[in-house]
């Protein structure tokens, strides 16, 4: 199994810790962030394979985080996954338009997340 470095952006401490543990159990290295601005700084300064980004962040929303990461050019290879409590077709369209590669609804199903990440990281 390949080890990937994953940026995890979630402002809720319990959700962040749960997702961090899940990803680490899968063998990945996880770098946590709790704000959009810190996520952008980390993404631009590092080379992550994947970033899980909560849409509802307290400072800069996840859509803006994705747009800024994508517009930098440096992180074009990073797979971006939106974490959100909304699953309407418009929510998915908005995530894709912002530059996300995938859309995951919270609360996250661990098995479904593991399968989806495996598929994304294989591409």
Where are these regions (language model features)?
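Conserved acidic carboxylate
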Residues: 10
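Two-component/phosphorelay signaling modules centered on CheY-like receiver
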Residues: 13-31
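Acidic, metal-coordinating helix/loop segments flanking the phosphotransfer/catalytic sites
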Residues: 32-50, 93
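Acidic catalytic/metal-coordinating carboxylates
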Residues: 35-38, 61-65
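The feature encodes the CheY-like receiver
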Residues: 58, 88
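C-terminal output helix
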Residues: 90, 108-117
């Amino acid at each position: 199994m390949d080890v990937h470095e994953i940026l995890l952006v979630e402002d809720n401490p319990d959700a962040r810790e749960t997702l961090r543990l899940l990803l680490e159990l899968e063998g990945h290295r996880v770098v946590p962030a709790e704000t959009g601005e810190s996520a952008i700084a980390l993404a631009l300064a590092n080379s992550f394979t994947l970033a899980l980004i909560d849409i509802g962040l307290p400072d800069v929303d996840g859509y803006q985080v994705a747009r800024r990461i994508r517009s930098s050019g440096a992180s074009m290879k990073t797979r971006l996954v939106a974490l959100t409590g909304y699953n309407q077709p418009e929510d998915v369209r908005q995530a894709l338009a912002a530059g996300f590669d995938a859309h995951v609804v919270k609360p996250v199903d661990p098995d479904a997340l593991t399968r989806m990440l495996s598929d994304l990281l294989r591409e």
